[in-house]
């Protein structure tokens, strides 16, 4: 019986060890912002000044908290960066393409990791309900990556409290101001770098839809990983429980034959005593 209890306790401890990585992935995601953001200046210098990048954005409003603005902007940056990355596939001049591709790929990874830290599934209803706040525009690289840097700054500001703050819009939401785009188009200084021959043609609808699927697919990758860990843990617990029950059933019935043998031995002693008494009585009668 003690061995069966020890086996069940061991399986329970293994279950806790398997669930530990799941708790860690849900409670902490580390720092998704790496030093690769320092290469943005080089990338902006490599892209033509008149190149336009499409982005759906939400203008800053007093009634929209910064951490909620972050939830609205990050998925759109992920889509735009995926589209930008795909456009380098069709470029024949490979002089600066590899460098630019590497930088954009690193920035895409950062924004995707950041999106995983934001618990996108938790606030997707908030994003759907406030889709009317989006405006679509085409930005030159300088202004596009200024917005990108602003998004990174907001994340750093609220990184420790994002899990605690839910996005709830007030009953009355102000409309985006007309001069909001003016704030976006302020110039910033980047070091001049030779511009590459990146073409400004748009990708076909199939390529665009594929990149959107990739962006959306990453959103659910973290949740799928958590589900797989949870299922593995539950399966191990079930197997451990079944093995414990089988072991207990095999060891427990062994105690019954022992008790039967003991009972039989007691019966034999009583019979022997009775037979001895009977013999003594016979001898006494004979005498």
UniProtKB/Swiss-Prot annotation:
Keywords in alphabetical order = Cell adhesion, Cell membrane, Cell projection, Cytoplasm, Cytoskeleton, Disulfide bond, Glycoprotein, Growth factor, Membrane, Secreted, Signal, Transmembrane, Transmembrane helix
Q: Where in the chain are disulfide-linked cysteines found? A: 29-117, 68-167
Leader sequence residues: 1-25
Provide the membrane-side ranges marked Extracellular in the record. 26-225
Pfam family membership, one: SCF
Question: Cytoplasmic side of the membrane: what ranges?
Answer: 247-287
Q: Which GO terms describe its molecular function?
A: cytokine activity; growth factor activity; stem cell factor receptor binding
The membrane spanning regions, by residue number, are 226-246
Glycosylated positions are 100, 106, 149, 178, 200, 206
Any Gene Ontology CC annotation: cytoplasm
SUPFAM superfamilies in the cross-refs: 4-helical cytokines (SSF47266)
User: How is the subunit organization of this protein annotated in UniProt?
Assistant: Homodimer, non-covalently linked.
The protein's name is: Kit ligand
């Amino acid at each position: 019986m003690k061995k069966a209890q020890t086996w069940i306790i061991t399986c329970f401890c293994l279950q806790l060890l398997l669930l530990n990585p799941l708790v860690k992935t849900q409670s902490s995601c580390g720092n998704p912002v790496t030093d690769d953001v320092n290469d943005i200046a080089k990338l902006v210098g490599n892209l033509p000044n008149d190149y336009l990048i499409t982005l759906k954005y939400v203008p800053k409003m007093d009634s929209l908290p910064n951490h909620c603005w972050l939830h609205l902007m990050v998925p759109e940056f992920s889509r735009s960066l995926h589209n930008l990355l795909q456009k380098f596939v069709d470029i024949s001049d490979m002089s600066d393409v590899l460098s630019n591709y590497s930088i954009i790929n690193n920035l895409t990874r950062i924004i995707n990791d950041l999106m995983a830290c934001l618990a996108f599934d938790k606030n997707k209803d908030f994003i759907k309900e406030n889709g009317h706040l989006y405006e679509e525009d085409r930005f030159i690289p300088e202004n596009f990556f200024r917005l990108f840097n602003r998004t990174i700054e907001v994340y750093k500001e609220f990184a420790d409290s994002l899990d605690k703050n839910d996005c709830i819009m007030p009953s009355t939401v102000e409309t985006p101001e007309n001069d909001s785009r003016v704030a976006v188009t302020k110039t910033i200084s980047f070091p001049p770098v030779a511009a590459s021959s990146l073409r400004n043609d748009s990708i076909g609808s199939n390529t665009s839809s594929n990149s959107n699927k990739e962006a959306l697919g990453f959103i659910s990758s973290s949740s799928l990983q958590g589900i797989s860990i949870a299922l593995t843990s539950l399966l191990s617990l079930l197997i451990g429980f079944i093995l414990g029950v089988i072991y207990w059933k095999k060891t427990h019935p062994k105690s019954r034959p022992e008790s039967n043998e003991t009972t039989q031995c007691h019966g034999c002693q009583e019979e022997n005593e009775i037979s001895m008494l009977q013999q003594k009585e016979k001898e006494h009668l004979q005498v």
